[in-house]
């Protein structure tokens, strides 16, 4: 058990955040979750959150005892001030700056600030996020340096000692699948595979071996490739 005994998990309903939730439930005595409605095109991820939380409780009595309140925050202002492939019905493409147009500027910065505010109010010690620098699309707000800087800034701004944990930061998608299996066995692995949502286009009509999705967007391709590598060992 971690010396800091409580955590707030940024929980979107996707593969990474569900795995991070399992990680937090293994490491902390009290765990709460927070989700954000920012006008995302793949809003289906928000719809699957309650189902996932319910099923997580059934995987382990210990997890059930540790899992606390869920907080849903309206951040629709993000869609109003940005024009990206995650918040608008536009084709996914690369921009001149080298970033995909799925990058939502300031999203994780705002998420972490709001999460820190909720953690402050709820008396929670740690923020847990699924940011990753190994298998990602080059988003600058997923970098380890960004998260470390945010931890310093948030603590200075609120006179707290919050810790930011990113369990997936240095592992690839295959290792993320393996982590889910290690944390919750076959029940968690199957829940992540069939219950979580990653597809940027919000497609949930066809179940592939790696889960639901269009199979063509960057998120689906990354998830599918990671699953194939995981199965291959």
Curated annotation (Swiss-Prot):
Cofactor stoichiometry and binding remark: Binds 1 zinc ion per subunit.
Keyword Metal-binding (UniProt): yes
Gene3D superfamilies hit by this protein: HUPs
Cofactor requirements of the protein: Zn(2+)
The protein's enzyme class: ligase
Catalytic activity: 7-carboxy-7-deazaguanine + NH4(+) + ATP = 7-cyano-7-deazaguanine + ADP + phosphate + H2O + H(+)
Protein name: 7-cyano-7-deazaguanine synthase
Species of the source: Herminiimonas arsenicoxydans
Taxonomic lineage of the native organism: Bacteria, Pseudomonadati, Pseudomonadota, Betaproteobacteria, Burkholderiales
């Amino acid at each position: 058990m971690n010396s800091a005994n409580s955590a707030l998990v940024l929980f979107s309903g996707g593969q990474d955040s569900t795995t991070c939730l399992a990680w937090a439930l293994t490491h902390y005595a009290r765990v709460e979750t927070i989700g954000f409605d920012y006008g995302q095109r793949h809003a289906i991820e928000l719809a699957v959150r309650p189902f996932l939380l319910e099923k997580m409780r059934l995987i382990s009595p210990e997890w059930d005892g540790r899992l606390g309140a869920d907080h849903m925050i309206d951040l629709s202002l993000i869609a109003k001030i940005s024009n990206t492939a995650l918040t608008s019905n536009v084709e996914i493409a690369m921009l001149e700056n080298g970033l995909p147009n799925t990058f939502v500027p300031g999203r994780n910065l705002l998420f972490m600030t709001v999460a820190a505010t909720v953690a402050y109010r709820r008396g929670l010690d740690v923020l847990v996020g699924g940011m990753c620098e190994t298998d990602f699309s080059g988003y600058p707000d997923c970098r380890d340096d960004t998260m470390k800087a945010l931890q310093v800034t948030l603590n200075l701004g609120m006179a707290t000692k919050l810790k930011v944990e990113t369990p997936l930061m240095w592992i690839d998608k295959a290792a993320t699948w393996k982590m889910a299996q290690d944390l919750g066995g076959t029940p968690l692995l199957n829940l992540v595979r069939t219950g979580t949502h990653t597809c940027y286009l919000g497609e949930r009509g066809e179940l592939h071996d790696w889960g639901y999705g269009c199979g063509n967007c960057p998120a689906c391709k990354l998830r599918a490739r990671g699953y194939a590598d995981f199965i291959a060992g």
